[in-house]
Amino acid sequence: MKVARASLRNFKRFQNLDLDFRNRATGDVASPFLIIGDNGTGKTTVLQAVALCLSMAAATTRSVRQFDWLGWVPGRFERWGRPVIELEVHFTGDEIEATRQAALRWFRSRDGEGQDQPFVEPADSPVVTVRMDGEHFEAGTREQLYQLRGRSYAAQLLRTDHTARELFDRLPGVFWFDQFRNLASPPNEEGADENGQGRVGFQVGVARLRQHLNRWQMAKIGGRWGPRDFLQELENLYRTVFNGRSFGLPEPMYRGGVPTPDDYYFMLNDGNRTYDIEEMSAGEQSVFPLLYEAVRLQFRHSIVLLDEVDLNLHPPLAQALVHALPRIGPECQFFLTTHSGAVASIISPEQTYRLPGGRLCL
């Protein structure tokens, strides 16, 4: 799934903005696509528009109030009039087929619940226009709208059928990482509830992540791993960006009693000494949530929005991250923002859009 065009009306600072996300030389839908501009010109706003519209259509965000992006203020959504967001979304044949298979498996799994209603098969349209008008959205037909809900079908199926995890590799979705991300950033599919409870304090967030990683680590050590080694996949991605670093063995916290995954540090190795994830550098903390979620949620064929891609990264590391994106999310379309000349220099000008305003610096 890729977005070729976007149109924003009365959305935050933009009264009227049209964007084309295709490579201006080849005409192909671009990835990565870089948005640059001075502070306050609306880079984050563009990413929010894409994430909000797609996640509402995909039923992963239930309302404007639930949209989880730090700095998003739902009470001002219609401050400048009724917002309209329109996206032109492209699908491959395999994505369409995978979504149809997931929808059918979900329908058949309901044990009679709702079986009196006919099965509505997602459409097979290679191009779908998704339109969000206020909080109402549409996609031509109901069947076309369901083309965006493959991961939602699979997530519901996964509650009762663990084999549904194999579906995610082929299903498109939308994921975003804001400019305030760190180890406490909430899991993508959970987000915040109606009262904004998706975010937690740093210590709680780190403890939650450490527990999840240690469960993977101990399952691997105990030989209880399934057909896919998620921990090894995560370490491989981590080493791709942070050359010379690796994962170490769990280190006990010595709290006494029978240890649980909460009672171990998750260790990393810099080639000289070891350290716990809580001791990560700011640059590592900005990248690790992307790597972890990419493995855990199996990013494929999806839209991934990464605000301030160079966040807390030395220029060579920022470039290493950009170069690693196709490996982090195969067949994904990445939307990036940056203030870094090092990042802008390695992305084609034909795949870069500069928002107007301010002084030209990139």
Give the residues covered by each predicted segment.
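C-terminal lobe/lid and adjacent interdomain/linker elements of RecA-like ASCE P-loop ATPase modules
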Residues: 1, 316-362
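Walker B catalytic acidic pair
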Residues: 307-309
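Conserved P-loop NTP-binding catalytic core
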Residues: 49-124
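Extended helical coiled-coil dimerization/tether regions that scaffold
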Residues: 2, 181-280, 285, 292-302, ...
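Phosphate-binding glycine-rich loops of NTP-binding sites
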Residues: 29-71, 99, 281, 287-293, ...
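Coupling/switch segment of ABC-type P-loop NTPase heads
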Residues: 109-242
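Pre-Walker A-like glycine/lysine-rich segment at the N-terminus of P-loop NTPase domains
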Residues: 1-55, 326
